[in-house]
Amino acid sequence: MRTCRAATAGKLTAVLATLVLALAACGGGLSPRAWAASVCEALTPWRAEINKLTSSTQQQMTAQTTPAQAKENLVRLFAGAEDASETARRKIDQAGVPETEHGEEISARFQASLGKVRDAYGRARDTIDGLGTGEATAFYDGVRTAVETLNKEYDASALDTSRLDSEELRQAFDEVPECR
């Protein structure tokens, strides 16, 4: 009787160990298609918000407002872009890790890219917030410089999805409806 129970317990332990190892190998991540869809669902509203804020910023640069009004509006706009970028970064973090080779690294690169964008908007906001408004020409020159710096930092932070280390993810980004 003891031998039978010991043999059954040994088999059960072996089955459970195999199951645990199999589940651990999966990593609990999302399929490449599901992860790509989650990423695009996070980035679509972010892009729309950034486009809206960019358009508003361009209008602000050409509008007939006082430097103090422009400063207030631009600080608010860049704070909005900073917040939108952090929201998108958080959503990608919440999407988890794609079940693909280098999945953790790929997820981290997406998050790092959005973190850099967020920080660039924050620096632009802080720079403009620090500008004096007594002399209009000096103020708008400072704004122009801040926006040029923002554009450079923004471009430098871009993540090229065509250079993903995973063919599965490249294909998923090309195919899922959320990314079109």
Predicted region positions:
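Immediate post-signal-peptide N-terminus of mature secreted/exported proteins
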Residues: 28-79, 175-179
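A charged, solvent-exposed segment within the mature domains of Sec-exported extracytoplasmic proteins
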Residues: 121-180
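Short, solvent-exposed, charged loop/turn and helix-capping segments
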Residues: 86-111, 123-135, 160
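Amphipathic alpha-helical coiled-coil/heptad-repeat segments
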Residues: 46, 53, 57, 81-84, ...
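Bacterial N-terminal signal peptides that target proteins for export
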Residues: 2-16
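C-terminal motif of bacterial Sec signal peptides marking the signal peptidase cleavage site
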Residues: 22-25
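Short, charged, amphipathic alpha-helical segments
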Residues: 33, 37, 68-79, 104-111, ...
